[in-house]
């Protein structure tokens, strides 16, 4: 059987047997088969078959991801992506099997998607969802923020407020986990399960350690609370409506796989409520202008930084006489920058600049040393091969910063992708932490303000609101719950549909986006992590040429961005009318 595909068996065997649905065993010279009905997720574990056997299975041969096919295929030469279905003499059996699979998926509902993403049974997926729902309903009872010594009605309203905040945080996790992990999954560096587990820890940590920086802007930087003096219940209803409206639109977007901006959702909802129920004077226009400008600047910055990072990789790694050694030398530098940035932004031991700088530098150096040793341990045998003069004879010469470089092959390619595979995992962690610190404010800001109004009888802008640690933890838990149950839906759009990603491209996009988001979080700007990441992925695509960016996907994403603010504002106005009627009846 002659196949028009070229597989990189060495690379696939060493890294991808456990992380993706493409491989060819080195010993059997086999082919990778994936279930025909699933272009992104595997329904069953990948089967590794020799060409002499099982040629009549109801499966389709899938061209491997560009990231782990030959380097020439993945880095600039024309790719042949025509999927060739294997001819099966038992066609009726094939149709029957596919119909049964679809029927089972429909029978299990959304749990089938979660089960496929994590490679677990639908029963297990349902059990996980039930545990999360039960925890969401019971944990608020034990939170201090529920209110101590308050009337029963106030406690019940506080309980409902915490649930609204959880709903918003849940949808942030469901939609925005792709900002941190989509490129890693798209390039094959992480599986869905690994991505979600990693994001869960780091999103929660970022929310706890950096959530207060942006939350204050969401509390007091959007609405002029003094306009609602004497109308505390109206403002309270408006804040709840903003959470409900933003959460509703995010859930719709997540269902269809649109990576919309959670920041757009919540800000649009709050502004819509303010304009209708408080007039133009209810909106803090100067602060809103600063926030809105960041929405335009952030994707541009993300695209620019990722473009430069990827061009630097191509210039200083791909075109180096020994790309493997060049990648091994560049990796600790990138790790140093990332670790030092997180240390100074999130965990400063002192506000005195020399001490904080020394701490950041020490953490960065330690991280770089540890990462260098990991690389030497895992890839040392391959790096030793590349030290011989014969290995680098056929490598391309240095030919300019913006040129199209053919790139390394063979052992050199394996080393470069191996190193950048590790680096992309670290950049995904970097992005998860930054995203948790920035986007948890979209749920916690209105939630904390609503609790303050309800329990203290003061408008959000009247006094400084201290954000309790349990409220930050509650928001972090909501994000983790959302990314666990629905996060896989949007990952496909970020990781697959904008441009083809490899570990080097994915690293460039994630590193650029995380840097921009972390810097904005430190300044207290609620920028759109979604805009930043999509811009960064597009920047990598532009670095490869305009034809490398899928215009249809970009148009669909931009269209969903444009309708987010008016939809959020409209829903907030409707929900406010409903909630004011309910509150007038209850109180």
From Swiss-Prot:
Residues 1-71 form a transit peptide. The chain crosses the membrane at residues 127-147, 154-174, 195-215, 233-253, 265-285, 289-309, 327-347, 352-372, 413-433, 465-485, 523-543, 559-579. It is found in: Plastid, Chloroplast inner membrane. Residues 74-106 are annotated as: Disordered. Residues 85-98 have a biased composition (Polar residues). Its main location: plastid. It is a multi-pass membrane protein. The keyword Membrane applies. Mostly expressed in young green tissues. Present in both auto- and heterotrophic tissues. Also expressed in root stele. GO terms for cellular component: chloroplast; chloroplast envelope; chloroplast inner membrane; cytosol. GO terms for biological process: phosphate ion transport. Low affinity H(+)/Pi chloroplastic cotransporter. Involved in inorganic phosphate (orthophosphate, Pi) uptake in green parts of plants in Pi-sufficient conditions. Required for Pi retranslocation during Pi deprivation. This is Inorganic phosphate transporter 2-1, chloroplastic. The gene is PHT2-1.
């Amino acid at each position: 059987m002659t196949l028009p595909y070229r597989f990189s068996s060495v690379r696939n065997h060493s890294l991808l047997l456990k992380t993706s649905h493409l491989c060819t065993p080195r010993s059997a010279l086999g082919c990778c088969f994936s279930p025909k009905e699933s272009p992104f997720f595997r329904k069953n574990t990948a089967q590794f078959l020799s060409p002499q056997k099982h040629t009549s299975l109801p499966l389709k041969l899938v061209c491997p991801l560009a990231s782990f096919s030959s380097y020439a295929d993945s880095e600039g030469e024309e790719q042949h992506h025509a999927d060739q279905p294997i001819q099966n003499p038992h066609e009726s059996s094939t149709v029957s099997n596919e119909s049964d699979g679809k029927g089972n998926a429909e029978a299990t509902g959304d749990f089938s998607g979660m089960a496929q993403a994590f490679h677990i049974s639908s029963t297990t997926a349902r059990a996980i969802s039930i545990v999360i729902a039960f925890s969401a309903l019971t944990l608020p009872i034990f939170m201090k923020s529920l209110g101590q010594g308050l009337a029963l009605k106030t406690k019940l309203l506080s309980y409902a407020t915490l649930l609204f905040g959880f709903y918003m945080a849940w949808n942030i996790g469901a939609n925005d986990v792709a900002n941190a992990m989509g490129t890693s999954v798209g390039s094959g560096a992480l599986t869905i399960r690994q991505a979600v587990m990693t994001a869960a820890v780091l999103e929660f940590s970022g929310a706890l350690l950096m959530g207060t920086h942006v939350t204050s802007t969401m509390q007091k930087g959007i609405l002029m609370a003094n306009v609602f003096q004497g109308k505390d219940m109206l403002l309270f209803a408006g804040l709840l409506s903003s959470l409900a409206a933003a959460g509703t639109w995010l859930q719709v977007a997540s269902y269809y796989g649109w990576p919309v901006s959670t920041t757009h959702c919540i800000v649009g909802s709050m502004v819509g409520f303010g304009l209708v129920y408080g007039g133009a004077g209810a909106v803090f226009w100067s602060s809103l202008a600063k926030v809105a400008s960041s929405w335009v600047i952030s994707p541009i910055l993300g695209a620019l930084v990722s473009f430069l990072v990827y061009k630097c990789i191509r210039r200083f790694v791909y075109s180096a006489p020994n790309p493997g050694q060049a990648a091994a030398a560049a990796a600790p530098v990138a790790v140093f920058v990332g670790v030092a940035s997180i240390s100074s932004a999130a965990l400063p031991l002192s506000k005195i600049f020399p001490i904080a700088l020394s701490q950041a530098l020490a953490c960065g150096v330690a991280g770089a040393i540890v990462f260098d040793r990991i690389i030497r341990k895992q890839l040392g045998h391959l790096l030793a091969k590349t030290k011989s003069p014969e290995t680098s004879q056929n490598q391309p010469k240095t030919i300019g910063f913006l040129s199209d470089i053919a790139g390394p092959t063979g052992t050199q390619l394996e080393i470069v992708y191996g190193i950048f595979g590790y680096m992309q995992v670290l950049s995904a962690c970097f992005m998860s932490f930054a995203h948790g610190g920035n986007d948890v404010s979209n749920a916690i800001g209105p939630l904390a303000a609503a609790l303050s109004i309800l329990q203290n009888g003061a408008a959000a802008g009247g006094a400084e609101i201290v954000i309790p640690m349990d409220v930050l933890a509650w928001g972090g838990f909501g994000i983790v719950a959302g990314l666990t149950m629905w996060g896989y839906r949007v990952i496909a759009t970020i990781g697959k549909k904008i441009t083809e990603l490899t570990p080097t491209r994915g690293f460039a996009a994630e590193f650029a986006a995380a840097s921009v988001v972390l810097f904005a979080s430190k300044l207290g700007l609620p920028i759109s992590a979604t805009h930043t990441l999509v811009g960064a992925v597009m920047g990598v695509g532009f670095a490869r040429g305009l034809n490398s960016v899928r215009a249809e996907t970009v148009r669909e994403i931009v269209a969903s961005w444009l309708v987010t603010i008016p939809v959020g504002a409209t829903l907030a106005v409707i929900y406010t009318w409903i909630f004011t009627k309910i509150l007038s009846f209850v109180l």
